């Protein structure tokens, strides 16, 4: 497209062309006031992407301020490529989760693949070596051909990119609900290890220092991707396929190694991934954070396609690109590092003292904008919020009481639900053992990755039960954080901090904004109670299809530290004769439960309650017992209740079964999703020591007969199922649904 074909500044205003880029009339007037003139086409595009929700968080910023972000171990909180937490011995862990929802709905393979690529770059831009990937996925019901296609392609995209770049995908979660039918959620998390002295930041400082472009050449892919991510999906979204980028994991691997070598050089001042809004966001954000300006000559930008305009170059979201600021005179040193990996590092500009983003093209100024107007001074909106009518209706409902006649069939039915069923079909496509540091592979409560050369490991998990959040966003927000911590504790780790990905509908709707506010309130309270500050994150709003929003889904990514490899614990029972305990009492809480969804085909009523003091106390007790060496296995009780938790504990163990006795209301005891509960197994010789450390109730013991037997108080058999039968149902559910032709 030639510059001559671009609309003039006057046309942009008169024909309100800025609206097509996502700017409102008020925002355009504000831009006019900032510049003291009408913006040209390139400048309008730059403002549009930088002021999109995706880049500016203009609708969510006031809510995000509620999160606790400080803690004794926090080295870098929100605002950089990734959060960083100290893990002792001069080492730290860098991690972040991000969404790639809209691109994955349109082009699922590349959408998911480039989501993985982007989050890896965020982590190594901090100077950290990525050691693990996780993902949190949401789809509609697996009975629909389109959902099957999206599911298969998203998983293939994640596997294709992660496996090629050589970083193990060690964990995550997949849930299926009709609310995600048209708008799947694809959240990717990356975790890296870094020495304290290698920590880098995305800043541009030092007048005269050189701005260098490294990595892949710029093409026309992904233009306005950030704006696309800030609007609802509709029938017309399919036409926006060009806004989805294409990834090259082999280029990423070279870029990763070159950048990690460059960060060790004193020549490097700052480094940032060209992510959403590409060259625009990386340059404007680095300059604004550093308190300087940047001038770039766009004729020098490496281009993949002929005749690209400043607008296209600045808004392209071509993958595998980084922007560096290098000390003046040291350009050759940095270029030599990248050349070693077959990559070009090209000087395209310099740091200035006037706090302006100035773009030159063919000898003329193509754009000139104050950097702070694009970054820290972007508009912030305080949206109205209103309690939804459905919430009041759910709160007023009497407690839901399920009726069960056949407990065996109920347990088998729950094990076949895709949200509970084995995700082996998914993680078998991931190389989760590459780099050989994975100690606990996918399928347990949390993945565990050891830190090479040390007697320490990291426990990693992603969690969020969005059904609870739909019923009650504040309670559901607390539960999301608490469950992540439970999973980390069950692995023998102390929870350190979280990263979050807030996936919600349109903030323009007061009921949706209320969900966001309440969820963040609940998460913040739980983070304070459990001592896990928020160190990084991402907001993804406008997750709607034809006006229907997804469930509120604030995914929590948590990292915990195992300070001695002997403390690593898994959920599978270990040997016959071990005693089985339950921590926590069951109440009749079935709102939003797997049982309610299976029996009624929908969810309603009140979410389970949670007492954060009780939660914190039980977690402390269990971790102390694990560290004392008196716990053989630990598993949190979540979807499907105690019955499903027991099944999972025996299905992971070869040839073992369990025999337990349950009193009280059997439906509640077995299937309620009451919070803050665990199933533990303990060797007989550790019984006394365990009971002194933990308040728990002994319910039975591990057997060697390969059968799960649950008896009532009167000795009657309530459940008797062979572990093989349960395992076949549990493992076969997802492959069976994918093969069925409906």
Curated annotation (Swiss-Prot):
Pathway: Purine metabolism; IMP biosynthesis via de novo pathway; 5-amino-1-(5-phospho-D-ribosyl)imidazole from N(2)-formyl-N(1)-(5-phospho-D-ribosyl)glycinamide: step 1/2. It catalyses: N(2)-formyl-N(1)-(5-phospho-beta-D-ribosyl)glycinamide + L-glutamine + ATP + H2O = 2-formamido-N(1)-(5-O-phospho-beta-D-ribosyl)acetamidine + L-glutamate + ADP + phosphate + H(+). It comes from the Bacteria. It is found in: Cytoplasm. Substrate binds at residues 99-102, 121, 245, 317-319, 540. Keywords: ATP-binding, Cytoplasm, Ligase, Magnesium, Metal-binding, Nucleotide-binding, Purine biosynthesis. Pfam families: AIRS, AIRS_C, FGAR-AT_linker. One of its GO terms (molecular function) is phosphoribosylformylglycinamidine synthase activity. GO terms for biological process: 'de novo' IMP biosynthetic process. Disulfide bonds: none annotated. Gene3D superfamilies: PurM-like C-terminal domain, PurM-like, N-terminal domain. It is an enzyme of class 6 (ligase). Monomer. Part of the FGAM synthase complex composed of 1 PurL, 1 PurQ and 2 PurS subunits. Part of the phosphoribosylformylglycinamidine synthase complex involved in the purines biosynthetic pathway. Catalyzes the ATP-dependent conversion of formylglycinamide ribonucleotide (FGAR) and glutamine to yield formylglycinamidine ribonucleotide (FGAM) and glutamate. The FGAM synthase complex is composed of three subunits. PurQ produces an ammonia molecule by converting glutamine to glutamate. PurL transfers the ammonia molecule to FGAR to form FGAM in an ATP-dependent manner. This is Phosphoribosylformylglycinamidine synthase subunit PurL. It comes from Geobacillus kaustophilus (strain HTA426). The gene is purL.
């Amino acid at each position: 497209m030639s510059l001559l074909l671009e609309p003039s500044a006057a046309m942009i205003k008169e024909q309100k062309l800025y609206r097509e880029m996502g700017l409102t009339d008020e925002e355009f007037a504000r831009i006019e006031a900032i510049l003291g003139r009408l913006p040209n086409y390139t400048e309008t595009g730059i403002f549009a992407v930088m002021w999109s929700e995706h880049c500016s968080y203009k609708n969510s910023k006031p809510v995000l301020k509620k999160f606790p972000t400080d803690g004794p171990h926090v080295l870098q909180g929100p605002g950089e490529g990734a959060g960083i937490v100290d893990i002792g011995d001069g080492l730290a862990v860098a991690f972040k989760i991000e969404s790639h929802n809209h691109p994955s709905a349109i082009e699922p393979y590349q959408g998911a693949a480039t989501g993985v690529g982007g989050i890896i770059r965020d982590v190594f831009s901090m100077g950290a070596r990525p050691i693990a990937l996780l993902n949190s996925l949401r789809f509609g019901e697996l009975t629909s051909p389109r959902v099957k296609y999206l599911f298969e392609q998203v998983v293939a995209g994640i596997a294709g990119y992660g496996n090629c770049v050589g970083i193990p995908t060690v964990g995550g979660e997949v849930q299926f609900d009709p609310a995600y039918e048209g708008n799947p959620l694809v959240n990717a998390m990356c975790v890296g290890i870094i020495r304290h002295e290698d920590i880098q930041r995305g800043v541009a400082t030092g007048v005269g220092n050189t701005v260098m472009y490294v990595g892949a050449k710029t093409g026309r892919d992904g233009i306005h991707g950030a704006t696309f991510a800030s609007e609802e999906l509709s029938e017309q979204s399919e036409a926006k396929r060009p806004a989805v980028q294409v990834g090259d994991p082999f280029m990423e691997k070279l870029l990763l190694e070159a950048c990690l070598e460059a960060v060790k050089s004193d020549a490097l001042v700052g480094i940032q991934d060209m992510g959403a809004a590409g060259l625009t966001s990386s340059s404007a954000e680095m300059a604004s954070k550093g308190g300087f300006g940047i001038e770039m000559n766009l004729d020098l930008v490496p281009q993949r396609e002929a005749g690209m305009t400043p607008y296209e170059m600045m808004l392209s979201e071509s993958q595998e690109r980084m922007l560096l600021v290098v000390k003046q005179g040291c350009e050759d040193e940095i270029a030599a590092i990248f050349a070693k990996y077959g990559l070009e590092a090209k000087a395209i500009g310099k740091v200035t003292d006037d706090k302006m983003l100035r773009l030159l093209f063919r000898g003329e100024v193509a754009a000139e904008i104050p950097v702070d107007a694009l970054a820290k001074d972007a508009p912030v909106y305080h949206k109205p919020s209103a309690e939804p009518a459905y919430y009041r209706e759910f709160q007023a409902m009497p407690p839901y009481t399920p009726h069960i006649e056949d407990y065996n069939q109920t347990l088998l039915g729950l094990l076949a639900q895709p949200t509970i069923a084995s995700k082996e079909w998914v993680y078998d496509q991931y190389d989760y053992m590459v780099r050989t540091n994975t100690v606990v592979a996918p399928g347990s409560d949390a993945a565990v990755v050891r830190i090479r050369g040390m007697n320490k490991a990291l426990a990693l998990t992603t969690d969020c039960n969005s059904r609870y959040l739909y019923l009650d966003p504040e309670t559901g927000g607390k539960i999301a954080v608490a469950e992540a911590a439970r999973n980390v504790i069950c692995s023998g780790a102390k929870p350190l901090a979280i990263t979050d990905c807030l996936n919600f509908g349109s903030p323009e709707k007061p009921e949706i904004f209320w969900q966001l506010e309440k969820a963040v309130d609940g998460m913040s309270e739980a983070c304070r109670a459990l001592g896990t500050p928020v160190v990084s994150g991402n907001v993804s709003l406008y997750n709607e299809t034809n006006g229907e929003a997804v469930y509120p889904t604030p995914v929590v990514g948590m990292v915990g530290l195992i300070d001695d490899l002997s403390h690593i614990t898994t959920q599978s029972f270990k040997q016959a004769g071990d005693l089985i305990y339950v921590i926590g009492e069951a109440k009749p809480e079935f709102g939003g439960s797997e049982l309610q969804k299976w029996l009624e085909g929908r969810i309603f009523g009140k979410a389970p309650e949670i007492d954060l003091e009780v939660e914190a106390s039980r977690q402390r007790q269990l971790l102390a017992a694990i560290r004392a060496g008196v716990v053989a296995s630990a598993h949190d009780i979540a979807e499907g209740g105690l019955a499903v938790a027991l099944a999972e504990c025996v299905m992971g163990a070869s040839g073992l079964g369990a025999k337990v006795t349950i009193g009280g209301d059997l439906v509640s005891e077995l299937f309620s999703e009451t919070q803050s509960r665990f199933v533990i197994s303990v060797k007989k010789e550790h019984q006394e020591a365990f009971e002194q450390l933990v308040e728990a109730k002994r319910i039975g013991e591990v057997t060697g007969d390969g059968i799960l037997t649950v008896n009532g108080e009167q000795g009657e058999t309530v459940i008797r199922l062979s572990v093989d039968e349960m395992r076949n149902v549990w493992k076969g559910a997802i492959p069976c649904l994918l093969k069925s032709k409906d």
